[in-house]
């Protein structure tokens, strides 16, 4: 049996603001093809269809592009399935500022997320961490 701890693991706190892991976002061509009985939510702001699944205790957000203008469309075109990792924060504006201090760049300012009860989300990019989504608690 493997030990669930790793020697030398470093704990980092980039965004502060009671930051907690929320989900992983994956690009898919068709949610219906994967899960025929699932009813995805259409988010016209993000230009995606969204559905959530639970994979052994981890929430996975499935993202299907609405059309070629969706940011997810290019992910699939380039065969990139992993879109982002999402963290829930108590104050999205403070978390953005903390991220900027650590080299993150805002690629989408806070907007309501239809699939998440219209809570604010934003996306940041870092060359080492890739794309991170922040979700207002």
Give the predicted meaning of each segment.
Residues 45-49, 115-119:
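Short acidic/glycine-enriched loop/turn segments that link adjacent beta-strands
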């Amino acid at each position: 049996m493997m030990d669930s701890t790793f020697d030398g693991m470093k704990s980092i706190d980039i965004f502060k603001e009671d930051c907690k892991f929320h989900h992983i976002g994956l690009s898919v061509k068709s949610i219906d093809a994967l899960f025929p009985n699932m009813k995805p939510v259409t988010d016209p702001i993000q230009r995606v269809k969204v559905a959530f699944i639970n994979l052994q205790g981890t929430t996975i957000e499935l993202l299907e592009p609405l059309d070629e203008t969706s940011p997810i469309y290019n992910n699939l075109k380039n065969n990139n399935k992993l879109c982002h990792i999402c963290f829930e924060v108590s104050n999205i504006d403070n978390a953005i500022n903390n991220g900027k201090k650590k080299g993150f760049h805002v690629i989408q300012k806070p907007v309501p997320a239809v699939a998440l009860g219209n809570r604010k989300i934003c996306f940041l990019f870092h060359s080492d961490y890739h794309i991170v989504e922040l979700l207002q608690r």
